[in-house]
């Protein structure tokens, strides 16, 4: 899959943000000339003091004071939240001699989709943090004495004859294995292990369940270590992991449940070790032996219109609503200047055009086309009053005028929150307008591609204005919305449906411009995001991924974090179930059918939500509309009557869109 339309390198006007952090504190100087990740799995390592933990499967890892702490986390669960608990099971450092000066902070010397390398220059330590590695790998670059401390008590401590493997057991039941590329002499007290000066590679792994049957496996694969890994999008609906490895033997890594599902679809020369299991908040991780993985998802074909078509007898009802919705369009009456809400209004109007096309009712199209031009062009031309798109060179990306001086402005867009959400709505409008008016599309193509590349750039060498795949995480196979904010539980994402919509909209833009690589990339990420949504956000009755008390009480996630599962929303409490359903459905579009293809689950979700609509104090009509839309998947007539009685709609939705949805459901 070649990078998308690399001949366009338009950037919006440059600005100097007053709220963005300085990346030079933690990235090595050779990385600073390239765009930098803003929503990545290691983001906490480059924010504030860089000392907040990150979850790098299967360990929580924390860097502070020239030491690196490793935790194989325990887990706490209730009906409201699940989270992994950080306890520094092992802390690795090189004691500072008086001549070395004070301890230094870590530096990131390299990073990739699947790895990050943390250097401690003052200690001669370099950690290869590779996602899914059961081993923590550290390179000691010059002869250096080491210290490994624990908050537990060391109950037993032994080595092999050559002093290249050590086994230690703690009083919390954990057993850890340490491997060295050359003999190392270790001594220990109750809670500290020390070495003489050593240089070479050390690998440390938890022995799962302290079960000796796994020890032979970890021994066998201990010599071959990965230093980096990249996800390659070579063909549609496929992502390939390739690792750079060193030393002899085969490479052992760990796969989460979605990996295993997609590995079985691919043409793989890998061996899955189902008995080797590590616990994870994303489900059990199992061993996989192989230098590269091929993950394949089922093909998903994006469409402008509904998949099965609108029932003929319902055309008149939809046309009546459509005429009224189009009649009320007036760009001069829009009061919001926020990029998110403005984008939703654009996408709402674009839906009206596509529904008119599907109904073969062209009368309303000219008015909607003019509305789209009047609302989109000022953002592309930089003439919008009160806000606009600007370019930040420090990290490499689009920020808004509001966001350049206010970290909370535009929901944190200026610190790289929610980029795929906001920009996805604009891209949807641009795609539809380009479909209607190809000449308009050609005129604004540079700006359109600049917007899409902000979160869909595959190659920073071909387009150095934007980081690689800003929001989509190729290891967990879904996106992160949280940007440059330090969070104890890492990155997070609330609305999966808006993430899906962003990639879907990009694929539609590819269709509008005749850009096959963009169609392929957008469709592939759409399909993967949907797989991730179904795996981790949709909580099915009787599911075993999460604890029983959580699964019994919930049918859909609130906010999903790298290290936590939360039922609450950013904007509403967990009890507002209609909001939890709605934020995982909006914006309602043809792709919604693929997200909610499991009718049995849809029924479970709606029946779980419906009692909340009788809540004292009332429920917003806009949220009710989304609940009724999903009810229409299995009870069309009941949902239709409820939708006809609605008195209001979400800002990105309309009566026309809800009627289109209900009347395009299959009777099967």
Curated annotation (Swiss-Prot):
This is Glucan endo-1,3-beta-D-glucosidase. The record marks 7, 636 as: Not glycosylated. (1,3-beta-D-glucosyl)n binds at residues 422, 494, 498. It is an enzyme of class 3 (hydrolase). Residues 564-566 are annotated as: May provide specificity for triple-helical beta-glucan. Residues 2-208 are annotated as: beta-sandwich subdomain. One of its GO terms (molecular function) is glucan endo-1,3-beta-D-glucosidase activity. The active site is at residues 418, 494, 498. It comes from Glycine max (Soybean). Cleaves internal linkages in 1,3-beta-glucan. Beta-glucan, a polysaccharide constituent of fungal cell walls, can act as an elicitor in the plant, triggering defense responses including phytoalexin synthesis. Glycans are attached at residues 65, 124, 160, 187, 465. GO terms for biological process: cell wall organization; cell wall polysaccharide catabolic process; detection of symbiotic fungus. It is found in: Secreted, Cell wall. It catalyses: Hydrolysis of (1->3)-beta-D-glucosidic linkages in (1->3)-beta-D-glucans. Residues 309-668 are annotated as: (alpha/beta)6 barrel subdomain.
């Amino acid at each position: 899959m070649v990078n998308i339309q690399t001949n366009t390198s338009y950037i919006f006007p440059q600005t100097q943000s007053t709220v963005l952090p300085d990346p030079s504190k933690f990235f090595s100087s050779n990385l600073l000339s390239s765009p930098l990740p803003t929503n990545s799995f290691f983001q906490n390592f480059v924010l504030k003091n860089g000392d907040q933990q990150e979850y790098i499967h299967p360990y929580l890892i924390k860097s502070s004071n020239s030491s690196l702490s490793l935790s194989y986390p325990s887990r706490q669960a209730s009906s409201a939240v699940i989270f992994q608990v950080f306890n520094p099971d092992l802390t690795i450092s090189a004691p500072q001699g008086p001549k070395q000066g004070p301890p230094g902070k870590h530096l990131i010397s390299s990073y990739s989709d699947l790895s990050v390398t943390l250097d401690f220059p003052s200690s001669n330590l370099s950690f290869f943090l590779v996602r899914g590695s059961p081993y923590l790998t550290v390179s000691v670059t010059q002869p250096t004495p080491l210290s490994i401390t624990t908050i537990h008590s060391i109950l037993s401590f032994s080595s092999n004859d050559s002093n290249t493997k050590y086994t230690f057991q703690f009083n919390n039941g954990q057993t850890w294995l340490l491997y060295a590329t050359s003999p190392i002499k270790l001594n220990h007290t109750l809670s500290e292990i020390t070495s003489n000066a050593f240089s070479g590679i050390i690998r440390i792994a938890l022995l799962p369940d302290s079960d000796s049957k796994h020890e032979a496996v970890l021994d066998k694969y201990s010599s071959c270590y990965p230093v980096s890994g990249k996800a390659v999008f070579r063909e549609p609906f496929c992502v390939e992991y390739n690792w750079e490895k060193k030393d002899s033997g085969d490479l052992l890594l760990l796969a989460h449940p979605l990996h295993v599902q997609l590995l079985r679809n691919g043409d793989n020369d890998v061996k899955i070790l189902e008995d080797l299991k590590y616990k994870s908040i994303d489900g059990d991780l199992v061993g996989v032996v192989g230098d590269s993985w091929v993950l394949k998802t089922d093909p998903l074909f994006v469409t402008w219109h509904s998949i099965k078509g609108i029932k003929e007898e319902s055309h008149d009802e939809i046309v009546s609503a459509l005429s009224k919705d189009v009649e009320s369009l007036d760009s001069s009456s829009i009061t919001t200047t926020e990029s998110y809400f403005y984008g939703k209004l654009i996408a709402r109007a674009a839906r009206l055009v596509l529904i008119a096309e599907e109904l073969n009712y062209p009368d309303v199209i000219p008015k909607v086309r003019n509305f789209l031009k009047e609302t989109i062009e000022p953002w592309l031309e930089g003439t919008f009053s009160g806000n606009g798109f600007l370019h930040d060179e420090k990290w490499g990306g689009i920020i808004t005028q509001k966001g350049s001086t206010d970290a909370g402005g535009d929901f944190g867009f200026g610190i790289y929150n929610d980029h795929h959400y906001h920009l996805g709505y604009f891209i949807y409008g641009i795609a539809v307008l380009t479909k209607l008016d190809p000449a308009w599309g050609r005129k604004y193509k540079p700006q359109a591609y600049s917007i899409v590349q902000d979160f869909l750039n595959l190659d920073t060498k071909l387009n150095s204005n934007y980081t690689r795949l800003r929001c989509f995480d190729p290891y967990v196979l879904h996106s992160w919305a949280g940007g440059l904010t330090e969070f104890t539980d890492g990155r997070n994402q609330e609305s999966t449906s808006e993430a899906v919509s962003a990639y879907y909209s990009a694929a539609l833009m590819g269709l509008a411009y005749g850009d096959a690589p963009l169609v392929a990339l957008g469709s592939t990420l759409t399909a993967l995001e949907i797989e991730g949504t179904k795996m981790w956000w949709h909580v099915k009755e009787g599911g075993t991924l999460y604890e029983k008390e959580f699964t019994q009480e919930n049918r859909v996630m609130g906010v999903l974090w790298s290290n936590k599962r939360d039922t609450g929303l950013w904007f509403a409490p967990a009890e507002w179930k209609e909001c939890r359903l709605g934020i995982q459905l909006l914006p309602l579009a043809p792709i919604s059918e693929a997200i909610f293809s499991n009718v049995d689950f849809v029924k479970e979700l709606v029946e779980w939500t419906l009692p909340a609509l009788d809540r004292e104090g009332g429920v917003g009509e806009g949220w009710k509309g989304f609940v009724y839309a999903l009810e229409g998947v299995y009870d069309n007539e009941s949902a239709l009557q409820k939708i006809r009685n609605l008195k209001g709609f979400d800002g990105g939705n309309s009566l026309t869109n809800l009627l289109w949805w209900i009347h395009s459901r299959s009777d099967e």
